[in-house]
């Protein structure tokens, strides 16, 4: 079928994508399905029916699975059973939340909520996936980091802390597992038009300032992340380990 098909095809693979109901997660699920992967999508509150339809339009199988990422200890048993019963070749740790508040007023419960979803549950799922991938000698793990894995941000101390930690964990897992055939990498999306970023886009002055700094001159779309995910999930990235790949329209280069 040629180099492109051989290097990027995900035919016969199964990907677990957390939080694929909308936005970046949905774009990734659709792209992976388009490359040939079946998708297991996890959610606790969001409907996955639209994502299921998009995956099935690509001729792939979509399975939904309930996980409450805000309760890391509670997901251990159900997630462990999932990894035991299904061969998951690709894990995409996409689920994430953000709370905005001045640092001096940031509620402790919001701090813990963000860390549980964005970091603690990610660690548990990665550890569980890694155990099975180590036995098979291959696997792909893709974490969703952020520009705030590199920068400090404004009004988002918990989110920034969690995304810095995700970048560090990505490198740490990669250092231990790369020699066993498991690639652990992260995508750091720039300013992507999703529900999470709506408050920023609604702020006319801040939106204008952001657009001025992005060399591409526009906000990214969820589909802009999909191709990167296919690359990191495929054989084409077999020698890429512990990398935080910014997909940001050039933001970090300016």
Swiss-Prot record:
Function: Catalyzes the reduction of 2,5-diketo-3-deoxygluconate (DKII or 4,6-dihydroxy-2,5-dioxohexanoate) into 2-keto-3-deoxygluconate (KDG or 2-dehydro-3-deoxygluconate) with a concomitant oxidation of NADH.
GO molecular function: 2-dehydro-3-deoxy-D-gluconate 5-dehydrogenase activity; 2-deoxy-D-gluconate 3-dehydrogenase activity; NAD binding; oxidoreductase activity, acting on the CH-OH group of donors, NAD or NADP as acceptor
Binding site for NAD(+): 16-40
Spans through the membrane: none
Record bears the keyword Signal: no
Annotated binding of substrate, by residue: 146
Organism: Bacillus subtilis (strain 168)
Pathway note: Glycan metabolism; pectin degradation; 2-dehydro-3-deoxy-D-gluconate from pectin: step 5/5
Gene Ontology biological process terms from the UniProt entry: pectin catabolic process
Protein's recorded name: 2-dehydro-3-deoxy-D-gluconate 5-dehydrogenase
InterPro entries: 2-deoxy-D-gluc_3_DH (IPR011286), NAD(P)-bd_dom_sf (IPR036291), Sc_DH/Rdtase_CS (IPR020904), SDR_fam (IPR002347)
Top EC category: oxidoreductase
Entry's family note: Belongs to the short-chain dehydrogenases/reductases (SDR) family.
PROSITE patterns: ADH_SHORT
